[in-house]
Amino acid sequence: MIKIKNNEEIALMREAGKITAGALELAATLVKPGVSLIHIDSEIHRFITSHGATPSFLHYNGFPASACISVNDEVIHGIPGKRLLTEGDIVTGDVGACYKGFHGDAARTIFCGEVSEDAKRLERVTRESFFEGIKYADPTHRLGDISHAIQEHVENAGFSVVKEFVGHGVGSHLHEDPEVPNYGRAGRGTRLYEGMTLAIEPMVNFGTADVSVLDNDWTVVTDDGMLSAHYENSILITANGPEILTIL
């Protein structure tokens, strides 16, 4: 069931979104050669809790960390451990913060030092596809309009959208209805309504769209070992278009 948020709930989601965005800005300053993923995770945890929130991902369905940190060919759900970053890595931080019962959810792909031109273009197209999609995030459109715009922008650039994992509603639960695929047909799907809150999250692969889950039962990787990028924000549908809740 899709939950329409009232003004009080929206205010709490704005605060959760600010904390989420702040944690990602902190993560961007920490991504450097020689830094461990577990250090980045611990600093994200410290930031979220110091702002009166709790990490949405910690122990969610058994996930063992406060942030998902995925490197290079890892698409999503990377578990931060002792791995040290190296020059040229691309690092996706996916962060959620729960403030007074409401969640923010966002992700960014961050460069570790100087990266390849291919990596830069992949990140740029992924980020652009989010903004192409939310051009249709208003009550005159349907979910399929967002999904189609994302897919079209990505595939026109020669990249692939991941289809096994999708965006979602967000609110008092980290994952709510509806699902928001990054592919689809314009004019189809659920009608958008004022007060809906959605996590729109293009996951884009440099090569094949095919992915697999590692033996840890969490980390998703590209089947061809090529790079993957991820860009996500929580948004609010308003009469005048989308309000992005997870950008400072």
Q: Which positions does each model-derived feature cover?
A:
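Active-site neighborhoods and metal-handling regions in enzymes and metal-associated proteins
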Residues: 1-248
